[in-house]
């Protein structure tokens, strides 16, 4: 036992010495110890390598030296199965990430999953690291990877209200209708009108219902008595006759809350009674034909500006 302690003690001292050098950004000492044979892939009690440590601390020059001396960025720690790239994402260390992504290990780390199925893109979206999100997508990270709970980076960005990340992910064709329309329903439930408008403008399907009860975004607007959301949804094509699993239309849901006059109830009664005009039906159909991926290219269509504005709902009073 004494022999084991004596043998281990110098190793622990070396580990502490090189970690202290990394923390201080002392590249000279780091390089010297590596050249003397210190392995960059040794792991501490948490399973961290020196690459984990330097990536989390933001020590770019140390990361470069470790990679030059054979550091392996695919190693996962014992805390959550995170790679050094996950920690770089957590702290927004985009320049450090670029060093790792330009290495031979890129394909092994860019979509690497933690114990919970989180990729670096999940982490970056969760923490709102928009420049990091851009970098990962530049290096062709999978835009809609599913965690073990079936969550995508876009969903995390929405839940955490990381607006910049949301826009970047949508610009890179993240699935706006993931989990049968989760994003639009979430925006309605949270009464987040700016998100609701953004998703609708980008072509979110207004009529997808929750798998557990069939409630569409318009049903949820009725439940929340949110007339602004209801107007937006209707203008973008929500079907007032869609029924949930209990056989209720949005109007029936609104009446079930209270039969007395309320803005949302009054609106739903009005639009349920009257059919859409031909002009609005044409707009809905044209937007559907253009398709999700091409809606952002409306400005490039060889049509009059007034028609482009109409297709973008710019004249809507909502």
UniProtKB/Swiss-Prot annotation:
Belongs to the ankyrin SOCS box (ASB) family. Interacts with CUL5. Interacts with RNF7. Interacts with PSRC1. The keyword Repeat applies. Pfam families: Ank_2 (PF12796), SOCS_box (PF07525). Residues 265-318 form the SOCS box domain. ANK repeats lie at residues 13-42, 46-75, 80-109, 116-145, 149-178, 180-208, 213-242. Pathway: Protein modification; protein ubiquitination. The gene is ASB7. One of its GO terms (biological process) is intracellular signal transduction. It comes from Pongo abelii (Sumatran orangutan). InterPro entries: Ankyrin_rpt (IPR002110), Ankyrin_rpt-contain_sf (IPR036770), ASB7_SOCS (IPR037326), SOCS_box (IPR001496), SOCS_box-like_dom_sf (IPR036036). This is Ankyrin repeat and SOCS box protein 7.
């Amino acid at each position: 036992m004494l022999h084991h302690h004596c043998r281990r003690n110098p190793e622990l001292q070396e580990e502490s010495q090189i970690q202290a050098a990394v923390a201080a950004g002392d590249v000279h000492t780091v390089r010297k110890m590596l050249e003397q044979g210190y392995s960059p892939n040794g792991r501490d009690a948490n399973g961290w390598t020196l690459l984990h440590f330097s990536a989390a601390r933001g020590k770019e020059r140390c990361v470069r030296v470790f990679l030059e001396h054979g550091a392996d960025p695919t190693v996962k720690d014992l805390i959550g199965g995170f790679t050094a790239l996950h920690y770089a994402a957590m702290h927004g260390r985009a320049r450090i990430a670029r060093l790792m992504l330009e290495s031979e290990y890129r394909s092994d780390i860019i979509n690497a999953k933690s114990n919970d199925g989180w990729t670096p893109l999940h982490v970056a979206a969760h923490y709102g690291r928009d420049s990091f999100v851009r970098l990962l997508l530049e290096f062709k990270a999978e835009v809609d990877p599913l965690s073990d709970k079936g969550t995508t980076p876009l969903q995390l960005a929405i839940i955490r209200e990381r607006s910049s990340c949301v826009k970047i992910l949508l610009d890179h064709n993240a699935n706006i209708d993931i989990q049968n329309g989760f994003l639009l329903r979430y925006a309605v439930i949270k009464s987040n009108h700016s998100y609701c408008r953004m998703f609708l403008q980008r072509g979110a399907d207004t009529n997808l219902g929750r798998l557990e009860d069939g409630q569409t975004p318009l049903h949820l607007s009725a439940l929340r008595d949110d007339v602004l959301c209801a107007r937006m949804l209707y203008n973008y094509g929500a079907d007032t006759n869609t029924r949930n699993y209990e056989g209720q239309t949005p109007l029936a849901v609104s009446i079930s809350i209270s039969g007395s006059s309320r803005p949302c109830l009054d609106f739903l009664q009005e639009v349920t009674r009257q059919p859409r005009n031909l002009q609005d039906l044409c707009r809905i159909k044209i937007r559907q034909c253009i398709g999700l991926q091409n809606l952002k290219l409306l400005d490039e269509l060889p049509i009059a500006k007034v028609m482009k504005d109409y297709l973008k709902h710019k004249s809507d009073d909502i």
